Amino acid sequence: YTKWFAVEMANRYGDKLRMNALVPGFFLAEQNRRLLTNEDGSYTDRGDKVIRSTPYKRFGNPDELTGALIWLLSDESTFVNGTSIKVDGGFTIFSGV
């Protein structure tokens, strides 16, 4: 969707509008804390599986999305269009090697 929409908006508005996406990995926050951690702070089975599949071996902190977002909103990324930026500690690329 991001790529298609970027092309559509470029055809309509030229370089006045950019369409990009942030693709967050697993960030520990209130909405998923019980799914990923036990009451004592240890990982649930699912949380442990996520950690084992993430090269950084930790969950992200929601504040770690800020840098990518600020860059996408800045003049430093004016030629960036139709891309999805993964902020996931390597989760989507890790094959368990």
Spans of model-derived segments:
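Hydrophobic alpha-helix immediately C-terminal to the catalytic Tyr-X-X-X-Lys motif of short-chain
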Residues: 1-9, 22, 72
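Conserved active-site helix of classical SDR/Rossmann-fold NAD(P)-dependent CH-OH oxidoreductases
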Residues: 2-7, 17, 66-67
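Alpha-helical segment proximal to the catalytic Tyr-Lys
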Residues: 7-12, 78
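Short, small/polar-rich loop/turn modules that mediate ligand/substrate recognition or access, typified
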Residues: 13, 18, 80-82
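Short, flexible catalytic-loop segment of classical short-chain dehydrogenase/reductase
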Residues: 24-35
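A conserved structural motif in NAD(P)-dependent oxidoreductases
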Residues: 41-43, 54-65
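Alpha-helical substrate-binding/gating segment
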Residues: 66-77
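Short C-terminal tail/terminal secondary-structure segment
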Residues: 70, 81-97
